[in-house]
């Protein structure tokens, strides 16, 4: 909505400027500009929809006596919500910084004569890691008093330490209760805010670089997949894979288990389906004028197919969360009831009422009706005329049998209403799989019938989208005996793929190869064990023998390998066994980057900051332990000489050969006022100096955690004159004023950009290619991170094209990350 509005604004403004008349005429005709925008031609959307009110009042989704509060809440702007992400130790430091610095500065602050409301924690989110505030984006950007807080939010969001996420969208991952060993599927993942929550749960223990579990994040929209990649990259996890498929027909994947291929079933599945979004009216005001019941009627079938496919891929005992940002029972309880009915007891709704203390919710509906967009009601399927059968389906109604309805326990679904805790509207249902789905049940063999002589048939790699239940006429009609889902899938695929004639009936035609749409991705090529590229790396960094070198991969089959990426062994298993079944957009983290003249330093590859936390536990050489004062110097100065660092650091660095190094800070528990989380940085040991290769936003993050505030670029430009004066007469060494100007206000110096060798030729070997220097996590600087033809701007603006001038990337904090 917002992008389309901006696209139409320019021609209208030009037309208004050409129109003659006074200021008063312009005000009436739409030519006068005020602080909120153009007055004419863009009337505010009236937040009323009689059909909406009639529909939900009739369904009684709101408790008696609360309707007015419900509607008033829908008309109010949605509070801004932020969630602290990342490893737990780092998250605690950010929380400490927020509470003791930024929030305290807001306590007595007034903007335009109004007292600023201090952010408050969400009562139901664990460990106070989620906060909400009524501060609007306009106030944050325009108020000088809030500039530091705004820059903090923007910078920390870019570096992935804070997520601007709608409060209710944080609920589904929490109810999944994912553990580090779980195999997790996110079926409709873009833009990725919930996916990042799941990744954080995998890495709950910071000391384990490779959790046993992984996340496969899928989205049907190819362009939105790249936004999903950008979100996931911030967390630098080797356990995330982004794929591009229709969620309703996700391919069956396989894994090698003890030399035998087995179907991959997931321990946790997040099924956050596309929906009409009428629970987002507070944020997406377009819904007020566009809402009809037709949207729900059209989406119901797709939602049910996606949920069914998810249930098929869930392991027995696993948990699946179905969620929408819609209040309509056609998209909510009707889908769950239909899924439970067709599962014949294989699925059941879990009681999660006690899992999020402090969350206010309403129980799911057990009775509802269907209404057409012209206001006609149908209480049951039998009342629907023949002419409406293509639009209205039997699965949209509650079950007829009262006992079956009661056994479903639809009241265990959670309905979140906006006026209860100042949120958006939301629906969540948690399903647990108790047994195989009914179409996966093995028919009993008649007595005396020999076993199947064909033997086990391996699934065909050319059948990526087969997801329909096997025909009972083929598998048998007596579902008394039950086999596991894996056995059922293997048997069904064996029958499907057997082309021989039986009883005069030909087998099905051979499956066609899966068609891939969107950008053609570079291949994922694992490095063979005998590759001569790895031994110099292993020797230079003294890698531990337990280092999983088989998990290293590149994105090229020809020429020099410029970057090395790493995945967990479980994702390696998935990649190797499903190359023809799925379209992988991205996986793995960058751990090494080639330096063309690196042979002079005994190793052609230098460390990449993106993967340093994954690599560090295996590195036994090239490690320099630094103090917190050293970290401040390394992050605020371009190439500090050894003599500027502490004597302990100098003694470690002076005898070390030139090349890539690890800079490690260990917190001192006896000094609680200092930074209490470990820091690992990658750097370069030059002839007489050390530099760090850390992205700018990550530098700012660490500096803030150490109590230093770096002012914004805008502030530096506005104070250019004062900056030059300060640079001309800096404080003398030991002078407290000079030290404060250097530490508290490093606006007078440019923070060193990650991987900018041009500013220090001595630090980069002669003949090296600047493009080879690691560039942090900015895809615009690393062509290998972005597919051919895909620019950084297109990551931030999926679906848009540049008009005229070169596009400018919009900060990720300005993007919608509510769902």
Predicted features by range, described:
Residues 2-116, 128-130, 372-407, 422-427, ...:
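Polybasic, low-complexity RNA-engagement segments
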């Amino acid at each position: 909505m917002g992008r389309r509005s901006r696209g139409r604004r320019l021609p209208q403004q030009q037309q208004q400027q050409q129109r003659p008349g006074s200021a008063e005429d312009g005000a009436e005709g739409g030519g006068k500009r005020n602080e909120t925008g153009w007055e004419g031609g863009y009337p505010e959307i009236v937040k009323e929809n009689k059909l909406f009110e009639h529909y939900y009042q009739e369904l009684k989704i709101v408790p008696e006596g609360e309707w007015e509060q419900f509607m008033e809440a829908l008309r109010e702007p949605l509070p801004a919500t932020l969630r602290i992400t990342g490893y737990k130790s780092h998250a605690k430091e950010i929380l400490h910084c927020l509470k003791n610095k930024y929030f305290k500065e807001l306590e007595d602050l007034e903007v335009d004569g109004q007292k600023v409301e201090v952010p408050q924690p969400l009562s139901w989110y664990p460990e106070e890691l989620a906060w909400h505030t009524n501060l609007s984006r306009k106030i944050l950007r325009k108020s000088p008093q809030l500039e530091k807080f705004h820059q903090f939010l923007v910078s920390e969001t870019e570096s992935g330490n804070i997520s601007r996420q709608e409060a209710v969208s944080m609920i589904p991952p929490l109810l999944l209760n994912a553990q580090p060993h779980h195999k997790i599927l996110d079926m409709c993942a873009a833009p990725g805010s919930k996916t990042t929550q799941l990744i954080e749960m995998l890495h709950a223990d910071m000391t384990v670089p490779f959790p046993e579990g992984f996340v496969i994040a899928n989205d049907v929209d190819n362009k939105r997949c790249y936004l999903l990649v950008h979100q996931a990259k911030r967390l630098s996890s080797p356990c995330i894979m982004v794929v591009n498929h229709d969620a309703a027909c996700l391919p069956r994947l396989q894994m090698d288990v003890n030399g035998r291929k087995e179907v991959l079933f997931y321990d946790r599945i997040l099924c956050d389906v596309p929906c009409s979004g009428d629970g987002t009216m507070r944020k997406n005001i377009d819904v007020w004028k566009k809402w009809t019941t037709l949207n729900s009627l059209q989406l119901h079938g797709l939602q049910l197919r996606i949920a069914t496919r998810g249930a098929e891929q869930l392991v027995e005992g696993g948990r699946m969360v179905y969620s929408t940002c819609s209040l309509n029972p056609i998209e909510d309880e009707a889908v769950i009831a239909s899924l439970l009915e067709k599962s014949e007891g294989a699925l059941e709704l879990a009681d999660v009422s006690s899992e999020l203390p402090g969350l206010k919710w309403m129980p799911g509906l057990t009775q509802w009706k269907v209404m057409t967009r012209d206001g006609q009601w149908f209480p049951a399927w039998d009342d629907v005329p023949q002419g409406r059968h293509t639009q209205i389906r039997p699965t949209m109604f509650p079950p007829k049998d009262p006992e079956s309805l009661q056994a479903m326990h639809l009241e265990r679904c959670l309905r979140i209403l906006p006026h209860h805790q100042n949120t958006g509207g939301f629906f969540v249902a948690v399903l647990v799989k108790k047994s195989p789905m009914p179409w996966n049940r093995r028919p009993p063999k008649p007595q005396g019938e020999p076993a199947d002589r064909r033997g086990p048939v391996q699934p065909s790699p050319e059948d990526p989208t087969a997801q329909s239940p096997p025909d009972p006429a083929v598998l048998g009609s007596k579902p008394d005996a039950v086999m596991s889902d894996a056995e059922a899938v293997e048997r069904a695929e064996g029958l499907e793929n057997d082309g021989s004639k039986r009883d005069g009936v030909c087998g099905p035609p051979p499956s066609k190869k899966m068609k891939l749409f969107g950008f053609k991705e570079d291949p994922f090529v694992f490095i063979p064990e005998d590759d001569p590229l790895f031994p110099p790396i292993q020797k230079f960094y003294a890698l531990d023998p337990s280092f999983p070198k088989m998990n290293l991969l590149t994105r090229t089959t020809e020429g020099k390998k410029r970057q090395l990426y790493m995945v967990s062994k479980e994702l390696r298993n998935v990649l190797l066994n499903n190359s023809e079944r799925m379209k992988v957009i991205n996986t793995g983290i960058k751990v090494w980057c080639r330096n063309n003249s690196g042979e002079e330093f005994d190793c052609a590859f230098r460390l990449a900051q993106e993967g340093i936390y994954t690599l560090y536990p295996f590195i036994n050489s090239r490690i320099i332990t630094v103090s917190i004062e050293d970290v401040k110097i390394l992050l605020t100065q371009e190439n500090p000489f050894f003599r500027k660092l502490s004597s302990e650091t100098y003694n470690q660095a002076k005898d070390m050969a030139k090349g890539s190094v690890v800079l490690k800070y260990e917190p001192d528990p006896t000094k609680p006022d200092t930074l209490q989380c470990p820091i690992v940085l990658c750097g370069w040991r030059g002839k007489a100096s050390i530099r760090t290769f850390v992205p700018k936003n990550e530098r700012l993050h660490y500096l803030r955690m150490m109590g230093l505030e770096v002012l914004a670029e805008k502030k530096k430009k506005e104070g250019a004159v004062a900056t030059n004066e300060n640079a001309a007469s800096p404080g003398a060494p030991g002078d407290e004023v000079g030290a404060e100007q250097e530490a508290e206000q490093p606006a007078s110096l440019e923070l060193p950009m990650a991987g900018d060798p041009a500013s220090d030729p001595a630090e980069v070997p002669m003949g090296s290619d600047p493009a080879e220097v690691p560039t942090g996590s900015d895809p615009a600087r690393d062509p290998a991170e972005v597919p051919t033809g895909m620019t950084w701007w297109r990551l931030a603006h999926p679906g848009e094209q540049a008009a005229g001038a070169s596009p400018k990337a919009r900060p990720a904090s300005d993007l919608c990350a509510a769902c």
